[in-house]
Amino acid sequence: MRIKLKEGIIMAMALSLCMPLHAAAAQRGYTESFQEENKDTEAICIIDMTEKVYNSLTRMPSVVDGKTQVMAFSVENLKSNSYVDGYDYGKSLNPGTRQTYYVVCTARSSGTTADVGLAYYNSQGKYIINSKTSLSGYDSYGTVSATPTFKNYGYVKNTGSAKLTASYVYMK
């Protein structure tokens, strides 16, 4: 009984030490300040797609097959009237060949809309939306064609009132 109590105390102490470290690491890794004031500072970039996005993709049989790959660009908690793009995370989409990009939008509530597409910065540093489509509703998705001439970045703007999750998928 005494051994179990001691083990429990040690385990509790270990957990209490780990939790602040994990929280600090998460804060360092996921909070970034952007230069542009209309960018969402609370958007989280996730390397792997979330379970929610995966569930959305499973309802798209033409996309989920052996040739489908998930881009390392997903955002969660994108606030209303704010946008993010892959440039912030160093994730450019430069296919080199013609490919179709699928964009999955998971709304936090019904009626959420989003503009998604591809963008690039020209030689003068001007931000140009290269190709765009609009998504609406829960678990909706659309396609965006890439232009291999430019170094494109995934672009997501929340045009609705609720937070949303968006993820890029491309098909070879």
PLM features per residue range, with description:
Residues 111-127:
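Short, surface-exposed beta-strand/strand-loop-strand elements in extracellular ectodomains
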Residues 93-111:
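Beta-rich globular "head" domains
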Residues 112-116, 155-172:
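Edge beta-strands of jelly-roll/beta-sandwich modules across compartments, strongly enriched
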Residues 100-104, 145-160:
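Noncatalytic modules at the cell exterior or secretory-pathway interfaces
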Residues 70, 86-90, 98-102, 139-141, ...:
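Intrinsic-disorder/low-complexity, polar/charged segments enriched in Ser/Thr/Lys/Arg/Asp/Glu/Gln
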Residues 71-73, 123-132:
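Surface-exposed loop/edge segments in extracytoplasmic proteins
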Residues 1-92:
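N-terminal prepro-regions of secreted/extracellular proteins
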Residues 91-93, 132-148:
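Beta-sandwich interaction modules
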